Amino acid sequence: MFARTVVVVCLFGLIAFGDNCRAQSDDVRSKQRFPSTYLYSVLNGQKGDKTTFRDSSGRAQGSATQSGSRISFRDGLGRAIGSAETSGSKTTFRDGSGSTIETATTNGERTTFRSSNGSNLGSASQARNNTTFRDSSGRSIGSAANSGNRTTFRDSSGRSSGSASSNRR
């Protein structure tokens, strides 16, 4: 069920795209209600029940725990900050109060992200073990490369900006 879906990759503006997360427009950020969080990702290859996100210095920034079709997200201090649930090709992200804040719809190798009001937030395209992320204008803003249960994130300049590792509980 999760072969093509799910992992939030930008917790607290540090994971996945570094400053690119913080550089998103106020309009986009206003639609996100996770604390300082920009939900961007769809990732192939995260096989574990729990995924831990780290910044480029190796510091833990948060986690995602999978249970069936639902994933629960926690920040770096272990506090619950929201969830994601997949049904068919669509993943719905909710904040801690249960309000929908974003959706991700997968069509083949491409996933499109939209805010709760339908605005285009960007996309992710997969090719083998690599995922490229683009903003709503189609500009590349980062990438992710999978190797086993570990994923390395890079910003648009190719600099390492974090990682994710999955382990079965």
Language model region names:
Residues M1-V7:
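Bacterial N-terminal signal peptides that target proteins for export
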Residues V7-A16:
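Bacterial N-terminal signal peptides
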Residues F17-A23:
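Sec/Tat signal peptide C-region and signal peptidase I cleavage site
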Residues S25-R169:
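Repetitive, compositionally biased segments used for assembly/scaffolding
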